[in-house]
């Protein structure tokens, strides 16, 4: 029986830039940063509040899992923002929004009230977008 999700993958155009974004901008912690045989870099990070869920920052280049044509298509989709969405939760969205903006994080939407809480939208350096969300009392009353 499956017990939990241990890793998820986010495809990135440049692992060094992704390291800077997720660690230095978002404040995630590095779990693993290792170079394997053949030069493949295994880079995982996690949020401080959820260290047992690792995010693998996966390069898009060709290799054992994909050919050059597939790699090129994957890169194009990422750059258009068509892949890699997720929800990042915070207790104080307005404070976090201002802190991240001051660090140079690009937002496409400022904090906005929604039925599920307050949400702002941000992108990483590759083009992957995320919802930064704060739950509210109203968000506990979901529409049916």
Predicted regions and their residues:
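Acetyl-CoA-dependent GNAT
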Residues: 58-71, 109, 113, 134-137
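Short hydrophobic/aromatic-rich motifs at helix boundaries and adjacent loops
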Residues: 14-15, 66-70, 95
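Core segments of cupin and vicinal oxygen chelate
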Residues: 2, 11-61
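Eukaryotic phosphotyrosine signaling hubs
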Residues: 5-7, 82-85
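A detector for short, charged/polar N-terminal pre-domain segments
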Residues: 75-76
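Vicinal oxygen chelate
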Residues: 1, 10, 33, 41-46, ...
């Amino acid at each position: 029986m499956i017990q939990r999700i241990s890793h998820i993958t986010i495809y990135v155009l440049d692992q060094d830039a992704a390291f800077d974004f997720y660690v230095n901008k978002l404040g995630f912690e590095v779990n693993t940063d290792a170079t394997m045989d053949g030069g493949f870099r295994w880079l995982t990070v996690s949020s401080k509040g959820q260290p047992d869920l690792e995010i693998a920052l996966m390069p898009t280049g060709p290799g054992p899992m994909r050919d050059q044509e597939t790699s090129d298509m994957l890169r194009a989709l990422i750059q258009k923002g068509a892949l890699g969405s997720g929800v990042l939760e915070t207790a104080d969205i307005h404070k976090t929004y201002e802190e991240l903006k001051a660090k140079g994080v690009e937002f496409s939407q400022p904090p906005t009230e929604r039925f599920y809480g307050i949400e702002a939208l941000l992108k990483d350096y590759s083009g992957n977008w995320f919802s930064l969300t704060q739950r509210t009392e109203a968000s506990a009353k979901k529409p049916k």
